[in-house]
Amino acid sequence: MMVTVSYDYDYNSTFLPDGFVDNYVERLSFGDLVAVVIMVVVFLVGVPGNALVVWVTACEARRHINAIWFLNLAAADLLSCLALPILLVSTVHLNHWYFGDTACKVLPSLILLNMYTSILLLATISADRLLLVLSPIWCQRFRGGCLAWTACGLAWVLALLLSSPSFLYRRTHNEHFSFKVYCVTDYGRDISKERAVALVRLLVGFIVPLITLTACYTFLLLRTWSRKATRSAKTVKVVVAVVSSFFVFWLPYQVTGILLAWHSPNSATYRNTKALDAVCVAFAYINCCINPIIYVVAGHGFQGRLLKSLPSVLRNVLTEESLDKRHQSFARSTVDTMPQKSESV
């Protein structure tokens, strides 16, 4: 799926068929078939699921800071899901690209934009939760919708910059033997470019966030449980589930990216990794549809989900109540909620 042009004397990867010989019949590999099935499911679940989350959170964004965070997460996931039909057409037709050079640069790159946007937004949410615990008075005075939207805007801009190599190095490639057009990532003849991109992607998009967010939520969970702040604990648990799913579904993609960048196309490791790459990319796409499922499961028990509409369940999870009347003391309730005069958490 993620095609990279290959030169005879460097280590850039290629997803062109393994040679064109007489009587060779092209067909989808088992890995491609699995990838197609996964992507179809992701599209069918992710588009309506994320569209519903966008609708619910957009209605609540003026009153609840949490709604702003989850609105941007859902928008990033929805954007990636909407590109899937075109990518599916290319995959089913053995990576033949029908849609021109501009679409080649933009559409396959959306998954990387999603990766960086998601992890940066999750880091922003984590910082927000941490500030609510460590500096509740500061949050009471300065935490508001304008600051939240500014933080989300910065996350999107930084994600665009981090994913820009994919936009810059993607192009269409005409295969002379098969007379097909492929959408490829061409790093040229300098292997260091591909390795640098893969390394930055691994460090910025995975390892550093994994370490920092693990430490952050270990502290937050211990703090909320010790104070029995049930409402805040529920929000933290939802975010922990979203963060965990991100790392689970992106891990295979990161591993294959490093292996393909550091091994010769002639090596057995490279060939075996390449055979799994389409599945790993599709597996990463699952992260684009899993969040709405997490929100619904976290909303209520099974009976509650039967009795209440999906928008009500999502609204309950993605926004937080204002001040609990049973905890009027600000010192005892800053983890749970903020006072009535401030925006809801």
UniProtKB/Swiss-Prot annotation:
The modification Phosphoserine is found at residues 309, 312, 322, 329, 333. Sulfation plays a critical role in the association of C5aR with C5a, but no significant role in the ability of the receptor to transduce a signal and mobilize calcium in response to a small peptide agonist. Phosphorylated on serine residues in response to C5a binding, resulting in internalization of the receptor and short-term desensitization to C5a. The modification Sulfotyrosine is found at residues 9, 11. Keywords: Cell membrane, Chemotaxis, Cytoplasmic vesicle, Disulfide bond, G-protein coupled receptor, Glycoprotein, Membrane, Phosphoprotein, Receptor, Sulfation, Transducer, Transmembrane, Transmembrane helix. Pfam families: 7tm_1. GO terms for molecular function: complement component C5a receptor activity; G protein-coupled receptor activity. Belongs to the G-protein coupled receptor 1 family. Residues 1-32, 89-105, 170-195, 261-277 are extracellular. Homodimer. May also form higher-order oligomers. Interacts (when phosphorylated) with ARRB1 and ARRB2; the interaction is associated with internalization of C5aR. GO terms for biological process: chemotaxis; inflammatory response; mRNA transcription by RNA polymerase II; phospholipase C-activating G protein-coupled receptor signaling pathway; positive regulation of cytosolic calcium ion concentration; positive regulation of epithelial cell proliferation; positive regulation of ERK1 and ERK2 cascade. Disulfide bonds join 104-183. It is a multi-pass membrane protein. SUPFAM superfamilies: Family A G protein-coupled receptor-like. It comes from the Eukaryota. Residues 60-64, 128-148, 222-237, 299-345 are cytoplasmic. GO terms for cellular component: apical part of cell; basolateral plasma membrane; cytoplasmic vesicle. InterPro entries: Anphylx_rcpt_C3a/C5a1-2, Formyl_rcpt-rel, GPCR_Rhodpsn, GPCR_Rhodpsn_7TM. It is found in: Cell membrane; Cytoplasmic vesicle. This is C5a anaphylatoxin chemotactic receptor 1. The gene is C5AR1. Glycans are attached at residue 12. Receptor for the chemotactic and inflammatory peptide anaphylatoxin C5a. The ligand interacts with at least two sites on the receptor: a high-affinity site on the extracellular N-terminus, and a second site in the transmembrane region which activates downstream signaling events. Receptor activation stimulates chemotaxis, granule enzyme release, intracellular calcium release and superoxide anion production.
